[in-house]
Structures are given as structure tokens and as C-alpha cells.
């Protein structure tokens, strides 16, 4: 993965998405290009070298956040793509609560209430098992 290109695209997307006159369509393009570049761990062949772990984690966190931001932007237009992005995030990090909320909203837009509720229940179980905590208030509010 070209980490510099990935980060540059995310930065451009952030600049386009914010500001007095957001350019959402262009931001979506930058985020989508960045997500397409992310294929997993940074320098996987050097996984056990200490110097790569902080950078690997930083890039992964940036990628997961970018996938959720992109999913949020795409939600009104293509809820199925938003759902796919949420599921990709959860496959990498099953405790990423923002991805559960995105998944719940995508299912709700598709009028698939049972799956939205199931997503919440999975979130509750995973967070309890991993950390012994309940979901954030905004997650519970979305459920209710």
C-alpha cells in the first residue's frame, strides 16, 4: 500500500468535506480512492519489527475511520455500499462502535428492522465481552 497516497487522499477528502461550502461529491471520491488503496496491515512482511507497529496501528485507525466517514456520506444514496463498508470495518476491528451505528442506519434505511436490531445486540455482546462496557448513549439511542 502507498501510505503517502492514502493519507493524502484522506486529507483531501477531509478538506473537501469540511469548511463553509462542503464539496461532498469530491470528498466521497477522495475517500473512496483512499479506501481502495487500503488492503490491510501496513508492511505486513515486517509485522514483528517494533518500529512498524505504531505506524501500522495509526494507518489502520485512519483507514477504519475513513471507511465509516465514507459510509456515512454514502448512506442516503447507496445504503448497500454503506453496509458493506461497515461490515469491512467490523471484520478488521469487531469493537468499532461507529461501524455498528452505520450498519444499524443502513439496515433501517432498507427497512430491515430485524437486522438493525441484531446489529445492536451484537454490538452489546462484543463490547461487554471485550471490555465489560455498554454501548455509547448515541448507539443505544439509535437502537431505541
Predicted regions and their residues:
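Intrinsically disordered, charged and Pro/Gly-enriched terminal/linker segments
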Residues: 1-144
Amino acid at each position: 500500500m502507498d501510505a503517502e497516497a492514502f493519507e493524502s487522499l484522506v486529507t483531501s477528502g477531509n478538506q473537501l468535506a469540511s469548511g463553509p461550502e462542503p464539496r461532498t461529491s469530491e470528498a466521497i471520491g477522495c475517500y473512496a480512492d483512499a479506501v481502495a488503496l487500503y488492503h490491510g496491515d501496513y508492511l505486513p512482511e515486517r509485522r514483528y519489527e517494533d518500529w512498524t507497529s505504531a505506524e501500522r496501528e495509526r494507518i489502520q485507525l485512519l483507514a477504519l475511520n475513513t471507511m465509516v466517514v465514507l459510509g456515512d456520506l454514502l448512506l442516503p444514496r447507496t445504503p448497500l455500499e454503506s453496509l458493506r463498508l461497515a461490515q469491512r470495518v467490523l471484520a478488521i476491528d469487531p469493537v468499532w462502535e461507529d461501524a455498528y451505528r452505520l450498519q444499524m442506519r443502513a439496515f433501517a434505511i432498507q427497512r430491515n428492522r430485524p437486522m438493525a436490531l441484531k446489529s445492536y445486540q451484537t454490538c452489546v455482546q462484543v463490547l461487554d465481552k471485550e471490555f465489560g462496557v455498554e454501548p455509547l448513549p448515541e448507539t443505544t439511542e439509535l437502537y431505541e
